[in-house]
Design a protein with these regions (language model features):
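Alpha-helical transmembrane segments of multi-pass membrane proteins
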Residues: 4, 45-49, 162-172
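Structural signal for the C-terminal ends of transmembrane alpha-helices
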Residues: 21-30, 138-148, 208-213
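Hydrophobic, glycine- and aromatic-enriched re-entrant/interface helices and adjoining loop segments
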Residues: 36-130, 151-155
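A juxtamembrane structural motif centered on a specific transmembrane helix
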Residues: 169-218
Length: 218
């Protein structure tokens, strides 16, 4: 994780956290081990934050600007403010496909990547955004069901690790778009433009399907 962070790639680094937490929790970690892990994690996070060699100034600005983006409306808070305007202006039914003023007017920078949910919400409104979240919920529930019926414990752990990553990515991206989470560069699975993200998601779903298939292998 530290090596990936040094690259620097904050979004990918954060993605490893839910895999670790889900694996330890499902693997039966006890209270004492949990406290040790939390302490070590807090020390590492504090060290990374205070060190000027790992987190870059722009990364720190991204992590803190969501608290009050209005403090820097033309800098680190610009994307969050424009995203909130896009989501709010969509209303219930949206402005229509290709008619979003924030998106088409280029007020929302690069809307097809990390802020694709804001662009979608502006054009399709609350109803469209709710439908997308419902589809994600159904996918995650199906994966959890496959984990419960897996042939062995390793298979269950693999699928639950995938569930943890996808849940984390969805929660952080949507939270980032509506101003509840910091801008970290984490994409929205199956929607954000980006080859590596799409490839990872399809590979993960393929692995989950393989685990499910092996229930029927004697």
């Amino acid at each position: 994780m530290i090596l990936v962070l040094i690259q620097p790639d904050l979004g990918t680094t954060l993605t490893y956290a839910p895999i670790l937490i889900a694996g330890l929790f499902l693997g039966g970690i006890n209270l004492r081990q949990s406290l040790i892990l939390i302490t070590v994690g807090a020390v590492l996070v504090g060290g990374v934050w205070t060190s000027g060699k790992i987190l870059k100034p722009y990364q720190k600005a991204r992590l803190t600007s969501f608290i009050n983006p209005g403090n820097d409306p033309h800098g680190s808070g610009y994307q969050v403010l424009q995203s909130e305007i896009a989501v709010g202006s969509g209303g219930v039914w949206g402005k229509g496909l290709g008619k979003g003023t924030q998106t088409q007017g280029y007020f929302l920078p690069i809307p097809y990547t990390d802020f694709i949910f804001a662009a979608f919400s502006e054009e399709h409104g609350f109803v469209g955004a709710f439908f997308v979240l419902l589809l994600y919920f159904l996918i995650l529930m199906r994966l959890i069901q496959n984990a419960q019926t897996a042939a062995d414990l390793p298979g269950s752990l693999i699928i639950m690790g995938i569930v943890a990553v996808l849940t984390f990515q969805i929660a952080v991206n949507v939270g980032m778009v509506i101003g509840l989470m910091p801008v970290t560069g984490i994409p929205l699975p199956l929607m954000s433009y980006g080859g590596s993200s799409v490839l990872f998601t399809f590979l993960a779903l393929g692995v989950a399907m393989n685990v499910r298939m092996r229930r029927f292998v004697n």
